[in-house]
Amino acid sequence: QVLVDLDGDPLYNGMSYYILPVARGKGGGLELARTGSESCPRTVVQTRSETSRGLPARLASPYRILIGSNIPLTIEFQPQKPYSCHGHSSRSLQWKVEKTQMVKIASSDEEQRLFGPFQIQPYRNHYKLVYCESESRNHHDDCRDLGISIDDQQNRLLVVKNGDPLVVQFAKANRGGDD
């Protein structure tokens, strides 16, 4: 099944999109924040403002031109203004899941992957993001939802959960005048 953006156009491999919540009133798109003792923003969070689109995220898969459901993806933020503290990788900030089950960005080239453990799956007429421990396309049983968990500083952390996914939609990030 080919996935579509808010305009009804297919999601294209290698293109950047804002990942936005379907539900209103609980925050906006996804971005990076400092959590814990981080000196540089490395944690993927939902913005507190529902009017904020967050950061554009590039969706990439080795399999097809169009992004379909249940295919392995890498997801990486592509901020227009690089974070100086991220050094050489500031233009491509690939997502990964840490042992804490929080989604963070890879801190080194060694942690980055050619194709990733994430997938987009249809969910209640929209979509959800999932994390799959197995990189095989046929192991859907190994996939768990990505949802929101609120920490002590009221950050809306993107985390691996059993159930209660963040239901999302995709808006093109490269439209003239939008950025």
From Swiss-Prot:
Annotated Gene Ontology cellular components are: extracellular region
Pfam families in alphabetical order: Kunitz_legume
Q: Which PROSITE patterns match?
A: SOYBEAN_KUNITZ
Q: Which residues cross the membrane?
A: none
Q: Which residues carry this modification: Pyrrolidone carboxylic acid?
A: 1
Q: What is its main location?
A: secreted
Residues carrying the site annotation Reactive bond for trypsin: 64-65
What InterPro entries has UniProt attached to this entry? Kunitz_inhibitor_STI-like_sf, Prot_inh_Kunz-lg
Q: Which UniProt keywords apply?
A: Disulfide bond, Protease inhibitor, Pyrrolidone carboxylic acid, Secreted, Serine protease inhibitor
UniProt note on tissues of expression: Abundant in dry seeds.
Q: Which SMART domains match?
A: STI
List where in the cell it is found. Secreted
Q: What does this protein do?
A: Inhibits trypsin, plasmin, human plasma kallikrein, chymotrypsin and factor XIIa activity.
Subunit structure and binding partners: Heterodimer of an alpha and a beta chain linked by a disulfide bond.
Misc: There are two isoforms of the beta chain with slightly different molecular masses: 4764 and 4765 Da. These isoforms differ in their N- and C-terminal amino acids.
Question: What is the protein name stated in its UniProt record?
Answer: Trypsin inhibitor
